[in-house]
From Swiss-Prot:
Signal peptide start and end residues: 1-32
Cofactor note: Binds 1 [4Fe-4S] cluster.
Enzyme class name: oxidoreductase
Domain 4Fe-4S Mo/W bis-MGD-type: 37-93
E.C. designation(s): 1.9.6.1
InterPro entries: Asp_de-COase-like_dom_sf, CT_Nitrate-R-NapA-like, MoPterin_dinucl-bd_dom, Mopterin_OxRdtase, Mopterin_OxRdtase_4Fe-4S_dom, MopterinOxRdtase_cofactor_BS, Periplasm_NO3_reductase_lsu, Prok_molybdopt-oxidoreductase
Domain of life: Bacteria
Keyword Transport appears in the UniProt entry: yes
Organism for this UniProt entry: Histophilus somni (strain 2336) (Haemophilus somnus)
Name the record gives this protein: Periplasmic nitrate reductase
The organism's taxonomic lineage, starting at the top: Bacteria, Pseudomonadati, Pseudomonadota, Gammaproteobacteria, Pasteurellales
Pfam families found in the cross-reference section: Molybdop_Fe4S4, Molybdopterin, Molydop_binding
Length: 827
């Protein structure tokens, strides 16, 4: 299929029109032409929306896909990436054998990539792991994992590192995108993830998008919002806030352009407006909330020697919250007047007031959506809190059409990274490694000796790169992501650690990405429906799929790699002698035996597969996915994180947890919807001991880096519709690659003119950390205000993240990809 950009955009417009009209693409239109195709359900491989698809296979290959008409999320529709899903697996450069850098028949850091056996690869890895553990301790080895890993893979990773190698040095790329949301959810409500669901869309009167371009990043949800808005033009509004104008502005009734970081001031202004105009829900506040004050002047998560960290007063207590009161909260937000918010944000006063009145209207049901504009922020945790504040002050929460809703960018950032707990500090179901009682629960469920799991935190994502560079960490295994392209400040902080001659880097990937080619060992990985899988999407919906085709060559799933690798270690090599002395039954056993042959994971027979494909189950001799899932699910059942039984998910189109007595939960914390809220309670934020949600007072604070005379422009980065993240999958789809082959830099025409530039010119974008060569766009879909440029990071030929400052939120440790200073010159 040869699709021009014009045809591509027309096709996408037609798809959007079908969405707005509420049409469903019937199955018979897609598969009637070839009855020899076998169809089964799966989940889209891309964003966190969680669209369900039907996958068509023939002669051992995926040959077609279509939206699943029985799926509640997408109702038979898929975005343009979803329609090209079959092609992501068949790039010409697909990896099919383990590849190790070798010279003269042995591993050499400067050697050429050479095919090796899996056994040779694992023996080399195990030797490096054991050496690093001996030299540097548990944090000498680490894993950088992903919100794209399946739930089963996430469980296996967490067990291998936290229960096997006794290292909490495992962190996901969700640290770069969802950590601020997760931290703020837990701090506010005591439990992670949104209380609402996508059904809010059909109930809301107003949608407010904070730093979210849903039209391109969550197009299927946007189609539902468009349908709601266009069907009710007199009663429903769409309101969009961003630092530049993008496609979501096309539907906006109120489109607001704000200065970078000023969202904090705007949100505090709205809270002040609500109080000053008596638009708060006093009864709700008194019954269901409590007030706290946050620490201020907390730094920017940079290296300790950075002057910005040296001058910050409260770096070490960044996450501290102090008991407060409504009166103190009122006093702290009082300075954020209309005039002050306008001064900081640059937003016209009438727009600010209109937005505040929208939240204040007691008859308006409002949903606030946000993604990376709020989360990828040096004060991302604060920004999340401030959105919650507005909904808690008005009581517009945990009701159909009312609530704060953080949208995820990866298919299982929620289900795997957050719910399973593949962060350095987490265990399943919101348990954390620093609490002894939580570690004890994990040890009991995993059948481990008491006192085995460590309370020592590992290095978070950005800190892993620094630790490799500094020699504090010697081995990294990266799975299911491309951090050498996606991470921040890659020239100064990431690449040096990877090529440090004392370090050993392993990358598991289906393709020779920038990360893979920078590694020492590449492990070829099975993709998507080449394995049985499960994802958890942004609305707490857990969805399963079965393996439908086999991976090419010797490529193996991440699950197979993790579990097989565990056979190369014994407890005597990695567990403390004193624990083994007290628990002699564990002595001399492999980690495979104690983690995966523990009587729980291996209790389900392969007979249950009834002959279906499942490479991992047949290799290990038991239904490993079912065993891992049921063991993991026991963490949350009866504790507000209830999952249904394994077999139910293979029959259903997903269920939103908590699932109690076979029934999913659409809105949490509200009586009548949530089984954990008792009769008569009305609302119960039961994640908190006192069942009260936190309203937090925190101020506006400036960004870590701002434009100056030398670097006179803001740079913000993100994605576009046609490509996903680093493009390692979408750029291998010919139609998607042709539609948008290379990255561009969007710039205001006046800024271009001042620099003697015009549309289409070749330019250099230069920051204090690096530079890229690209082309300028002054006419396209993204319209930047003067003083700001926008670019994407999908293009491996440009590596835009060389420009990015590795500043993070000091509480969540999430990177700010949205704000740094650059200059633009003609190339």
């Amino acid at each position: 299929m040869n699709l021009s950009r014009r045809d591509f955009m027309k096709a996408n417009a037609a798809l959007a029109a079908a969405s707005v009209a509420g049409l469903i693409i019937p199955v018979k239109n897609v598969n009637a032409a070839d009855t020899s195709i076998t169809w089964d359900k799966a989940v889209c491989r891309f964003c966190g929306t969680g669209c369900a698809v039907l996958v068509g296979t023939k002669d051992g290959r995926v040959v077609a896909s279509q939206g699943d008409p029985d799926a509640e999320v997408n109702r038979g529709l898929n975005c343009i990436k979803g329609y090209f899903l079959p092609k992501i697996m068949y790039g010409k450069d697909r990896l099919t054998h383990p590849m190790l850098r070798m010279k003269n028949g042995q591993y050499d850091k400067e050697g050429e990539f050479t095919p090796v056996t899996w056994d040779f690869a694992f023996k080399t890895m195990a030797e490096k792991f054991k050496s690093a553990l001996k030299a540097k301790g548990p944090n000498g080895v680490g894993m950088f994992t992903s919100g794209q890993s399946t739930i089963f893979e996430g469980v296996a990773k967490s067990k291998l590192f936290k229960a096997g190698l006794l290292s909490n040095n495992i962190d996901p790329n969700a640290r770069h995108c969802m950590a601020s949301a997760a931290v703020a959810f837990v701090r506010t409500f005591g439990i992670d993830e949104p209380m609402g669901c996508y059904d809010d869309i059909e109930h809301a009167d107003a949608f407010v998008l904070w730093g979210s371009n849903m039209a391109e990043m969550h197009p299927i949800l946007w189609s539902r919002i468009s349908d709601r808005r266009l069907a009710n033009p007199d009663t429903v509004s769409v309101n969009v806030l961003s630092t530049f104008e993008h496609r979501s502005f096309e539907l906006a009734d109120l489109g607001i352009l704000l200065k970078p970081q000023s969202d904090l001031a705007i949100l505090n202004y709205i809270a002040n407006y609500l109080i000053e105009n008596n638009a708060i829900n006093r009864e709700f506040i008194e019954k269901h909330t409590k007030f706290k004050r946050g620490e201020t002047d907390i730094g920017y998560g940079l290296r300790p020697q950075d002057p910005r960290e040296q001058t910050a007063k409260n770096v070490k207590t960044a996450g501290k919250m102090y008991d407060s009161s409504f009166e103190e909260f009122k006093k702290l937000v009082a300075p954020y007047t209309l005039e002050k918010a306008h001064e900081i944000s640059g937003v016209p006063k009438e727009q600010l007031e209109k937005l505040a009145k929208l939240y204040a209207d007691p008859n308006k049901k409002v949903v606030s959506y946000w993604t990376m504009g709020i989360n990828q922020h040096t004060r991302g945790v604060w920004a999340n809190h401030l959105i919650y504040n507005i909904h808690l002050l008005t009581g517009k929460i945990s009701l159909p059409g009312c609530g704060p809703f953080s949208l995820t960018g990866q298919p299982s950032a929620c289900g795997t990274a957050r719910e399973v707990g593949t962060f350095i500090h987490r265990l399943p179901a919101d348990l954390v490694v620093i609490k002894p009682e939580h570690r004890k629960i994990a040890e009991k469920i995993w059948k481990l000796p008491e006192g085995l799991i460590s309370d020592k935190l590992g290095f978070h994502a950005v800190a892993q790169s620094r630790a490799l560079k500094d020699g504090k960490m010697q081995v990294l295994w990266q799975m299911c992501n491309n951090n050498m392209q996606a991470g921040p400040n890659i020239n100064e902080e990431t690449y040096p650690g990877w090529r440090n001659p004392d370090n050993f880097i392993v990358v598991s990937d289906p393709y020779p990405t920038v990360s893979a080619l920078s590694a020492d060992l590449i492990l070829p990985t099975a993709m998507w429906v080449e394995k049985e899988g499960a994802y958890g999407n942004a609305e707490r919906r857990t969805q399963f799929w079965r393996q439908q085709v086999k991976a090419p060559g010797e490529a193996k799933s991440d699950l197979w790699q993790l579990v097989e690798f565990s056979k190369y270690f014994t407890t005597d090599e990695v567990w403390p002698a004193e624990i083994l002395a007290k628990n002699p039954a564990y002595q001399g056993k492999t980690l495979y035996e104690v983690l995966y042959l523990n009587g729980q994971v291996n209790q389900y027979s392969n007979d249950e597969l009834k002959g279906r494909l499942n490479d991992e189950a047949y290799h290990f001799g038991f239904y490993i996915q079912k065993g891992l899932f049921e063991e993991y699910a026991s963490f949350g059942r009866g504790h507000g994180h209830d999952l249904a039984d394994f077999d139910t998910y293979h029959k259903a189109r997903g269920l939103r947890w908590p699932v109690v007595d076979g029934k999913e939960t659409l809105w949490r914390y509200r009586e009548g919807y949530d089984p954990y809220v008792k009769a008569g309670e009305g609302v119960s934020f039961y994640g908190q001991a006192d069942k009260r949600a936190v309203i937090l007072a925190v101020p506006y604070e400036p960004p870590a880096e701002v434009p100056d005379r030398k670097y006179d422009l803001w740079l913000t980065t993100g994605r576009i519709l046609e490509h996903w993240h680093t493009g390692s999958m979408t750029r291998r789809v010919p139609e998607l690659h042709r539609s948008f082959p290379n990255n561009l830099v969007w710039m205001n025409p006046n800024d271009a003119k001042k620099r003697g530039l015009k549309h289409g010119d070749k330019i250099k974008v230069i920051s204090r950390r690096g530079e890229i060569t690209s082309y300028i766009d002054t006419r396209g879909r993204n319209k930047c205000p003067e003083g700001l440029i926008y670019t994407t990071f999908f293009d491996a030929g440009q590596l835009a993240n060389k420009l990015i400052l590795d500043a993070t939120d000091p509480i969540s440790k999430e990177t700010d990809f949205k704000k740094c200073a650059v200059k633009v010159v003609k190339a």
